[in-house]
């Protein structure tokens, strides 16, 4: 499984380049970030080039698609993000969908589908994939998309290879559970994964989830994308990555 380190979580509030150098020296070649506008993207590009790293994902602007009145603003944010992603050699753009507006869920759902259908040609032309992200109800009260099942339905309705789901195992374990029962039948609709220990959003080696089994099953289902490590370490971040690799290796699961 190709492991991608989320620098915005494991190295929160710090300059990216030294962290990128450190994780690269420990054999981790995938790196991702949240809001690119909070970083010197030239610094990220230089570090990735120096280390032979792939920038696996960045976020687009956080503009709600639940509100059709803001769709033009969302598309403008995506138009701004695509060239940044291209400059970083990044093929995946993460999109949150916004809070519940109070309108009916049917109308908000349709607004999201319509907005993503408008966005799809931009992504197809750029050779990039947008991944939409459900979030859990506890950490993100008011957020519209909680259910992976609704997320998969949206992806099917948009009907573009350039729009997929970001399946965040941490969020979905809190919201609905049945992790592999939701992932495996829908593996072709998933463009990226995020993972953290539950509860606490700390290391994958802690908590109630058997991540070695989960990763093995995802790999066995034919997924060939990146598996994002998006957790808040309780100790040294790089040491925690080494511990994760040792845990996976001990269980016979390869992480690279």
Predicted regions located by residue number:
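N-terminal substrate-binding region of glycoside hydrolase catalytic domains
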Residues: 20-35, 59-63
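Active-site-adjacent beta->alpha loops and helix N-cap segments on the catalytic face
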Residues: 37-49, 103-104
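Histidine-acidic metal/acid-base catalytic patches
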Residues: 1-27, 89-91, 114, 145-167, ...
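Generic structural signal for hydrophobic
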Residues: 22-23, 48, 81, 85, ...
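Conserved beta-strand positions in the central sheet of alpha/beta enzyme cores
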Residues: 32, 57-59, 94, 131, ...
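Active-site acidic/histidine proton-transfer and metal-coordination neighborhood
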Residues: 50, 65-164, 174, 255
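Active-site-proximal loop/turn and secondary-structure-junction residues that shape catalytic pockets
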Residues: 9-11, 35-37, 60-64, 98-101, ...
């Amino acid at each position: 499984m190709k492991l991608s380190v989320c620098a915005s979580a494991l190295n929160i509030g710090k300059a990216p380049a030294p962290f990128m150098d450190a994780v690269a020296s420990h054999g981790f070649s995938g790196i991702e970030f949240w809001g690119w506008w909070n970083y010197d993207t030239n610094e990220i590009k230089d570090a990735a080039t120096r280390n032979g790293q792939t920038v696996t994902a960045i976020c687009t602007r956080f503009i709600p698609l639940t509100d059709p009145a803001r769709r033009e603003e969302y598309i403008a944010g995506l138009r701004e993000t695509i060239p940044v992603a291209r400059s970083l050699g990044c093929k995946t753009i993460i999109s949150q969908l916004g809070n519940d507006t109070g309108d009916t869920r049917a109308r908000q759902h349709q607004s999201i589908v319509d907005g993503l259908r408008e966005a799809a040609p931009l992504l197809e032309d750029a050779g990039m994939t947008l991944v939409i992200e459900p979030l859990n109800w506890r950490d993100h009260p008011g957020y519209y998309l909680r259910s992976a099942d609704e997320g998969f339905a949206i992806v099917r309705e948009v009907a573009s290879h350039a729009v997929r789901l970001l399946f965040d195992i941490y969020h979905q374990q809190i919201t609905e559970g049945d992790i592999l029962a939701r992932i495996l039948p829908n593996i072709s609709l998933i463009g990226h994964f995020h993972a953290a220990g539950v509860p606490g959003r700390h290391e994958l080696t802690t908590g109630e989830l058997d991540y070695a089994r989960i990763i093995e099953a995802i790999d066995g289902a034919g997924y060939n994308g990146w598996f994002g490590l998006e957790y808040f370490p309780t100790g040294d971040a790089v040491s925690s990555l080494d511990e994760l690799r040792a845990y996976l290796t001990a269980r016979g699961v390869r992480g690279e």
